[in-house]
Curated annotation (Swiss-Prot):
Organism: Caulobacter vibrioides (strain ATCC 19089 / CIP 103742 / CB 15) (Caulobacter crescentus)
Enzymatic reactions: acetate + ATP + CoA = acetyl-CoA + AMP + diphosphate
Enzyme class: ligase
Protein name: Acetyl-coenzyme A synthetase
Modification note: Acetylated. Deacetylation by the SIR2-homolog deacetylase activates the enzyme.
Cofactor: Mg(2+)
GO molecular function: acetate-CoA ligase activity; AMP binding; ATP binding; metal ion binding
Function of the protein: Catalyzes the conversion of acetate into acetyl-CoA (AcCoA), an essential intermediate at the junction of anabolic and catabolic pathways. AcsA undergoes a two-step reaction. In the first half reaction, AcsA combines acetate with ATP to form acetyl-adenylate (AcAMP) intermediate. In the second half reaction, it can then transfer the acetyl group from AcAMP to the sulfhydryl group of CoA, forming the product AcCoA.
Superkingdom of origin: Bacteria
Length: 647
């Protein structure tokens, strides 16, 4: 185990050339205290505004007067900020580099070409009746047209809801229903790790539950022969050239919605996280520039899918708002071999690489030779996102990929935060393996105990943020009360992150994981209630409880306790059926790693399942189960311990 004491100082040459060095970081901290309005105004001023904002911040976390507004009288367009304003100087510069699933498949889009594609798709949407404020569901593979679709929506003021390509038809339908989307953009199929993903077939299945969806715009990607529904389905390649290559950007108020992105909560139904136009883009743009210390002409590669917030903020909006070059990768880290990531870095001369600990742990297991046989000399900065990175993986990343020279920005943030909140700055922050380090200037984290009392100094507690920042989500779509209750009612006057955290004597923050009923599997947030609901929907299952447990590769695995209906035999075949069932109901990433048959579950006399005990059994911490005397039937625990499934 690495001690808190292991520190990697900022390299002198990097500090010298960085956008923000230690002195600039300290100056920003001082300024945000002395002149917060000026500080936040300057962050907004990095964007092009049709009408610059004069009202910078209007925020109250109080229940009786709850509101979050940033730059509320400003007017701008996100698409124009990501494309049009760069055209005079960067029309022929590469905006997007594409690397396909199969090696040897790659292409580029310049800012001029991106402008044309976005305008044409925006005009197709308008021709099909999509208007400002309409919700558009996007279910696409990791290809440049996914970014084009998002930017086309932003151009005309439509609100995009991107659904990850790994979600099942039922999950897609739930997301379409929740935001009452009438228009879907998809592809015939996706490619991933040498396999085909039946995107259009999944949409067709989902839309059986959403008959109000009037139009589906399908991109021919693999060329698969897929059925088209007359009057509903339109093929992008058939209509692209029928519309103008120019589409004026729609002026949008800073607080107009930009997108909805669904994320798992501690209750069953996913939440539609709503981000707005001005504050979100200002924060995504500034954090990209500051944290990645981005310099013109560099190739930036974030491996996240656009179906997740990391793909929104740091594949599309952050890089393009800065006039950068962003790499979009269709494939997976280990196809066709575990050298693939490193080959892509070499091939495209990637300067900044941002990936998830899950991928690093899997590649670390394959051995160093897959990395070292490639030329990674183009790399300048490494990043980690999605879950806490264990110190062993951090040190491997630093030693083998970074040649013991490159800084690692271990970034902590959430779908709800829009962009990074706690992270090193490469030119300013000494690094501790496994620590997200310190908050960005203007971000106000605190640790609290269960009663909400502030904990000072070196301590451990629940992580809250005591004041707003521009990228903060504004509401849960269609359920503002759920927004308040989920994030602001546990600790009144503070945003509750749902994460536990430790702070050391140097003020560095170490994220310890979720403290609510949410687990983080390979950087994907999954609500345990969602998986439990899927299991209980199976005809053989009477009851289910799901917890996370430590997993060598994924960070956390899914451990399910399942009580079968009377007369149903517990067999290995049924266990496999239940795993496939969850894959079908939610998606492959939610499939249980372990299913333990449970004749009964540990419940209090009021009927509440004691998940704390289930977590301890799953983690094999059998000596610390705690007091079981309050359970209705303590003998249930003995049975679960005796029949614990191996992990």
């Amino acid at each position: 185990m690495v001690s808190d004491g292991q520190v990697f100082p900022v390299p002198a040459d990097l500090a010298r050339d960085a956008h923000i060095d230690a002195a600039a970081y300290d100056a920003a901290l001082a300024r945000v205290e002395a002149d917060p309005e000026g500080y936040w105004r300057d962050i907004a001023a990095r964007l092009d505004w049709i009408t610059p904002p004069t009202k910078i911040k209007d925020v109250s976390y109080a229940k009786e007067d709850f509101r979050i507004r940033w730059y509320e009288d400003g007017v701008l367009n996100v698409s124009a900020n990501c494309i049009d304003r760069h055209l005079p100087a960067k029309k022929d510069d590469v905006a997007l580099v594409f690397e396909g699933d199969e090696p040897g498949t790659s292409s580029t889009l310049t800012y001029g070409q991106l402008h044309e594609e976005v305008c044409r798709m925006a005009n197709v949407l308008k021709a099909q009746g999509v208007k400002k404020g309409d919700r558009v569901t996007i279910y696409l593979p990791m290809v440049p047209l996914a970014a084009v679709a998002m930017l086309a929506c932003a151009r005309i003021g439509a609100v995009h809801s991107v659904v990850f390509g790994g979600f099942s038809p039922d999950s897609i339908a739930g997301r379409i229903q929740d935001c009452a989307s009438h228009f879907v953009i998809t592809a015939d199929e996706g490619r991933r790790g040498g396999r085909r993903v039946p995107l259009k077939a999944n949409i067709d299945e989902a839309l059986k539950h959403c008959p109000w969806v009037g139009k589906v715009l399908m991109i021919r990607w693999t060329g698969a022969d897929v059925p088209l529904k007359a009057g509903r389905d339109i093929v992008w390649q058939d209509v692209r050239d029928t519309v103008s290559a120019d589409c004026p950007p729609e002026p949008m108020n800073a607080e107009d919605p930009l997108f909805i992105l669904y994320t798992s909560g501690s209750t069953g139904k996913p939440k539609g996280v709503l981000h707005t136009t001005g504050g979100y883009l200002a924060w995504a743009s500034w954090t990209f520039w500051a944290v990645f210390d981005y310099k013109p002409g560099e190739v930036f590669w974030c491996t996240a899918d656009v179906g997740w917030v990391t793909g929104h903020s740091y594949v599309v909006y952050g890089p393009l708002a800065n006039g950068g070059t962003s790499l979009i990768f269709e494939g997976v880290p280990n196809y066709p071999t575990p050298s693939r990531f490193w080959e892509v870095i070499d091939k495209h001369q990637v300067s900044i690489f941002y990936t998830a600990p899950t991928a690093l742990r899997a590649l670390m297991r394959e051995g160093d030779a897959h990395v070292t046989k490639n030329d990674l000399s183009s790399l300048r900065l490494l990043g980690s996102v999605g879950e806490p990175i264990n110190p062993e993986a951090w040190l491997w990343y630093h030693r083998v990929v970074g040649k013991e020279k490159l800084p690692i920005v271990d970034t902590w943030w959430q779908t709800e935060t829009g962009g990074m909140l706690i992270t090193p700055l490469p030119g300013a922050t000494a690094l501790k393996p496994g620590s997200a380090s310190k908050p960005l200037p203007g971000v106000k984290p605190q640790l609290v105990d269960a009663e909400g009392k502030f904990l000072d100094g070196a301590t451990e507690g629940n992580l809250v943020i005591t004041d707003s920042w521009p990228g903060q989500m504004r509401t849960v779509y269609g359920d503002h009360q759920r927004f308040f209750e989920t994030y602001f009612s546990t600790y009144p006057g503070k945003y509750f992150t749902g994460d536990g955290c430790r702070r050391d004597a140097d003020g560095y923050y170490w994220i310890t994981g979720r403290v609510d009923d949410v687990i983080n599997v390979s950087g994907h947030r999954l609500g345990t209630a969602e998986i439990e609901s899927a299991l209980v929907a199976h005809e053989t299952v009477a009851e289910a409880a799901v917890v996370g447990y430590p997993h060598d590769i994924k960070g956390q695995g899914v451990y399910a306790y399942v009580t079968l209906k009377a007369g149903i035999e517990a067999t290995d075949a049924l266990r496999k059926d239940l795993v496939l069932w969850v894959r079908h109901e939610i998606g492959p990433f939610a499939a249980p790693d372990v299913i333990q048959w449970a004749p009964g579950l540990p419940k209090t006399r009021s009927g509440k399942i004691m998940r704390r005990i289930l977590r301890k059994i799953a983690e094999n911490e059998l000596g610390s189960l705690g007091d079981t005397s309050t359970l209705a039937d303590p003998s249930v625990v003995d049975d679960l311990v005796k029949n614990r499934a191996g992990t």
